[in-house]
Amino acid sequence: AAGVLHHPVYPDIDGVDDFAGAVFHSARWDHSAPLEGKRIGIIGTGSTAVQITDDLIGKVSHLSLFQRTAQWIFPQENPAFSEQEKQVFRDQPQAMDDLHASLTRLFADTFGRAVIGDKEQMQRVEDTCRANLEDSVRDPELRAKLTPDYQAACKRLIISPGFYEAIQQPNAELVTDPIERVEAGGVRTKDGRLHELDVLVLATGFDGHSFMRPMDLIGRDGVDLKDVWAETTQAHRSISLPGFPNYFMLVGPNSPIGNFSLIDISERQLGYIMQLIELWRGGTVNEISARQDAADRFNASVKDAMGDTVWVTGCQSWYLDKHGNPAMWPFTFDKFCDDMSAPDLDEYELVS
């Protein structure tokens, strides 16, 4: 259960170590760095950068957001539950379960289908994002800078209730000129301007393809996972690896992390894995690992289905591996649920 987004990626920018103020990756936040009333620079415009901007804009004297790529922003509707509604959930737990099920189905049938090729649903997603931008940002010059040149959801779709409002505050600046280098006093862009800063935040994302690495994992006959995954990361049903008995992953390669709720995904994968573990616990088998032919068939089906997905429409993102292959789930939510309902033991090598 090593997760996906936990290996920070640092930008290849000259002079970062020369910066005189506090500089840190957003995932390695320096809580000792004072922020109130300071000049803050944020490099990056992904989900983390958007959240930081929204949170800090009312606390700092100036915020410079350095943007390389504009992002689509989906409006967030997240109303608080009233005390009366919460009491209903306490009195009738099934009501909460029913709400969860209805929201899961709604998301699966809309966004979940949009990303795998449902053109009607994708048009709705993109129309909503575009309307959010046009309704929220009146200045045409700023709106043009914030308009992406790729299809919505090709990169990870950002959901935010307040980013557009934050970036339009008097103490906010969207910087789209490329960064030349970092200096002691701030960030110099290629137009020659020095953006003077007290704190520099590197919201530059994560390596989404390392998974449990650099942890050493040695399989049967001394096979090293680093060698198996040297070119691309693959697994059988995102969970098991041929030649690595009794090793199972949550949210492994090609899990639907860009499609559905990560919590729901993990719970269903865990239920599947526990059925395999029960075979071992009950003494039926000593070793369980995916068959190579089963894994090959699964990964071939994934590759064949990727052509219809939004992730191959031309943008660059961590959804793609170094060869440009999407590491996502190209099927429906229902197929994922069916696949995770029970393991097909014919797909596994079982050693007593």
What spans do the regions from the language model cover?
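Short hydrophobic core segments
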Residues: 1-5, 40-43, 63, 179, ...
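Central helical "cap/lid" subdomain
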Residues: 10-25, 188-239
